[in-house]
A protein has these predicted regions:
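Hydrophobic alpha-helical segments within soluble ligand-binding/sensing domains
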Residues: 89, 145-170, 208-210, 256-259, ...
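Bacterial signal peptide processing site
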Residues: 25-28
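Extracytoplasmic "Venus flytrap"
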Residues: 41-70, 74, 78-90, 108-111, ...
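Hinge/cleft segment of the Venus flytrap/periplasmic-binding protein
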Residues: 43, 192-193, 282-327
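C-terminal motif of bacterial Sec signal peptides marking the signal peptidase cleavage site
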Residues: 19-23
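Flexible loop/hinge segments that line or gate small-molecule binding clefts
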Residues: 112, 116-153, 167, 256-264, ...
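Short, solvent-exposed amphipathic alpha-helices that sit
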Residues: 58-73, 154-158, 177-198, 212, ...
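Hydrophobic alpha-helical
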Residues: 90, 106-122, 189, 203-261
Length: 327
C-alpha cells in the first residue's frame, strides 16, 4: 500500500506560530550549555531542554540551533543538558525542577525511566512539552504537546522504497538500546518488507558500527539493502559496503552535511527527514507561548515534523539548509 503522511496538523501549527510571533512584535558524559536570547526582548523566562544526545552526534546540533533561535526570538534563557543514559537524563530533569525553571522540553526516549520524573515537574506546576522520541507516551507523561516525526510511518516508507528497488533482504541497524523511536523505525521497515533483520550496533563508536555491518555483509550475501537509523551510521554503512566489496544500497533516517552530500553523490539512496531544527524551535516556542498566553500548539495533539524523503530528486533544494544547520 502507498504510505501518505497527514501534515495538516503540523501546517496549522506552524501557521498559528507565525501569527503568534507577529503578535509578540548521551553512552557518554552529561552535556550542559546555557544561552540567553536577545532578539525578542527579555521575557524573563528560563527554559530547560533535556535530551538523550550521544556526545559527538551532530544530529542534535540542529535541535539546539532551533531551540536557541526560539530563545533568541522570545528573549528567553535556554539551559540545555543531555545524557544518553535514561537514568541520568531523569536526574537532569529533576535538576531542572529543583532550579525552578519556567518550563521543560524533553525527549522521552525511554518512557518508563523518564515519565515518573516528568510527572514530578507537572505536579510542581512546571509546564512540560516533549519532542523527538516518545510520541506514544507524551500524554501519559503529562506533556502539553509532542513535536516529532511518525517513526513507524517513516520505516514503512523506507521498506516500500527498498522493496520497489528490488530488495531481497534488508539489514536494519539500531544504535541505541531501549529507544522506542529507533525500534519503531525498524518495525515499520519490517512491516512493509518482512525479510528484514535487525542488528544492534554501538552508536557511540563509528569504527565498531562499520566493523559490525561489514561482518554481517560478509556472513550473509543475500543482504542487498541497509537501512540505518542515523546519519552517522549511514556513513559508517557506506564504508562497510566498500570494505566488504558488496553490491548493497543504503537508506538512512536523519542527516548531516556529509550524509546529505552522500545522497547527492549517489552513495546513499535517501534520507528520511524529521526536521530536527523545527522540533527544537517549536519545543521552546510552545513553552513561551504557554507561559505568555496559555497557547497549546496543535491543541495538545502530536504535531508531526516528518517523515519526508530526501533523495536525488530534491537534495539540491535541501542541501543548502542542511549545511546552514537549519534542516
Amino acid at each position: 500500500m502507498k504510505i501518505n503522511v497527514r501534515t495538516s496538523v503540523a501546517v496549522l501549527a506552524v501557521a498559528a506560530l507565525a501569527t503568534a510571533l507577529g503578535a509578540c512584535s548521551g553512552g557518554g558524559a552529561e552535556k550542559t550549555t546555557s544561552s540567553t536570547g536577545g532578539g525578542g526582548g527579555n521575557s524573563g523566562y528560563t527554559f530547560a531542554m533535556i535530551t538523550h544526545e550521544t556526545p559527538g552526534d551532530t544530529f542534535w546540533d540542529r535541535i539546539k540551533a532551533g531551540a536557541q533561535q526560539a530563545a533568541k526570538d522570545t528573549g528567553s534563557t535556554l539551559k540545555y543538558s543531555a545524557d544518553p543514559d535514561a537514568t541520568k537524563q531523569a536526574v537532569l530533569i529533576q535538576n531542572a525542577i529543583d532550579s525552578k525553571v519556567d518550563g521543560i522540553a524533553t525527549t522521552l526516549v525511554t518512557p518508563e525511566a523518564l515519565i515518573p520524573t516528568v510527572k514530578k515537574a507537572v505536579a510542581a506546576g512546571i509546564p512540560v512539552d516533549s519532542f523527538n522520541s516518545g510520541i506514544d507516551y507524551y500524554k501519559q507523561a503529562g506533556s502539553l504537546v509532542h513535536f516529532a516525526s511518525n517513526e513507524f510511518l517513516g520505516g514503512q516508507g523506507a521498506g516500500q522504497r527498498a522493496k520497489a528497488d528490488g530488495a531481497t533482504k534488508i539489514l536494519c541497524t539500531i544504535q541505541q538500546t531501549g529507544s522506542v523511536a529507533l525500534e519503531d523505525r525498524c518495525k515499520g521497515v519490517k512491516d512493509q518488507f518482512p525479510n528484514t533483520e535487525n542488528i544492534q550496533v554501538n552508536g557511540a563508536d563509528d569504527a565498531a558500527v562499520t566493523s559490525a555491518i561489514q561482518a554481517k555483509l560478509s556472513q550473509d550475501k543475500t543482504i542487498n539493502w541497509i537501512i540505518t537509523l542515523g546519519a552517522a551510521q549511514g556513513l559508517d554503512a557506506v564504508k562497510a559496503v566498500k570494505q566488504a566489496g558488496a553490491s548493497v544500497k543504503i537508506g538512512t533516517f536523519d542527516t548531516n552535511p556529509d550524509a546529505a552530500q552522500a545522497v547527492q553523490d549517489g552513495q546513499i539512496q535517501f534520507f528520511i527527514d524529521q526536521q530536527p531544527y523545527l522540533q527544537g524551535y517549536l519545543s521552546v516556542m510552545e513553552l513561551y507561548l504557554y507561559k505568555k498566553n496559555g497557547n497549546i500548539i496543535g491543541g495538545g495533539n502530536a504535531v508531526l515534523t516528518g517523515p519526508s524523503f530526501v533523495d536525488k530528486t530534491n537534495i539540491g533544494q535541501i542541501l543548502p539548509f542542511v549545511k546552514a544547520n537549519t534542516r
